[in-house]
Amino acid sequence: MPNTAFPLVSVVTLTWNTTEVTCDFLRSINEHCQYPNLEIIVVDNGSAVDPTAVFKEIRSDVQVLLNGINLGFTGGNNVGIKAAKGRYLFIVNNDTEFTPGLLEGLVEVFEQHPDAGMVSPKFHYYFHKGTIEYAGYHPVNPFTGRNSMVGCKEKDSGQYETLSTTHYAHGGGMMVPRKVIDEVGALPEEFFIYYEELDWSEQIKRKGYRIYYQPKSLIYHKESMTTGKESPFKAFYHTRNRILFMKRNMSSLQKAIFFTYFTLFTIPKNTLKFIIKKQFLHLKSFWKGILWHFNREIKFNT
């Protein structure tokens, strides 16, 4: 890519009481990123201690925005999105590490494919290098309201090396043009956390854009290969947002399928599971996630 073809990229990441993780993230940019036209925005989501000075010791040009309170993944990142000046915004988790050519490969997709509305790189597990986490997303199952990542936990033997469209971007690293954000809107704050990237992808596709997976760009993610630890917090937001996503994005037939399955299978199964495990706070949060939808006016994506 010639030097004149390096449009400004805004890297936006979120931190909340994870100063050292974010420091490692910034160090990885210093070590591996050669992209010459870059701004870095770290949004602090109400950490107990202001991390600004620590971050600036590592990267003097970093912009640190202090929210004061935890606005969630969506609200926090939207603060950074609003402040960003780049033609392209790379919204990325702070528990990731860059590799050489990451940004160049993502920008290339937009420069060569005018229909691109969002693109994610290939994800490898940081603690299991050579093992794929993400090489695209499968569609959401209309019965369960869940989906899975293409290639997840497979050894990377070059089987996903073709640039391709995919159903959804990876919320841990997604590049979006400013013009698309201006047209579609920022991250949907109704979700707070979980399912937000799926909903945003649906909004972008409805405007006629496509979601791309770029295998030339690789990022390492400090995500466990095993299922994440359950918590009442996750039980609430996963339940609430799964229902919210299906309400906002699925056809009448798909919603009928989902709610029939959810009522007859998901509710009894999860209720019994939490009772057997004596996870009564999880059980309460699961039901709170369901009951949240009663007497709520849902904004549908059109």
Language model: regions and residue ranges:
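Conserved donor NDP-sugar-binding/catalytic core segment of glycosyltransferases
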Residues: 97-134, 140-142
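A conserved acidic beta->alpha catalytic loop
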Residues: 28, 44-53, 69
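Glycine-rich, basic loop-to-helix element that forms the pyrophosphate-binding segment
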Residues: 66-84, 94-96
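Short aromatic/hydrophobic "clamp" motif used to bind/position activated sugar donors
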Residues: 89
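N-proximal low-complexity "stem/linker" segments adjacent to membrane-targeting elements
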Residues: 1-31
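Short beta-strand/loop segment that forms part of the nucleotide-sugar
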Residues: 37-46, 63-67
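Non-catalytic, C-terminal membrane-associated alpha-helical segments of glycosyltransferases
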Residues: 233-241, 251-302
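A short, conserved alpha-helix in the catalytic core of glycosyltransferases
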Residues: 167-186, 190-218
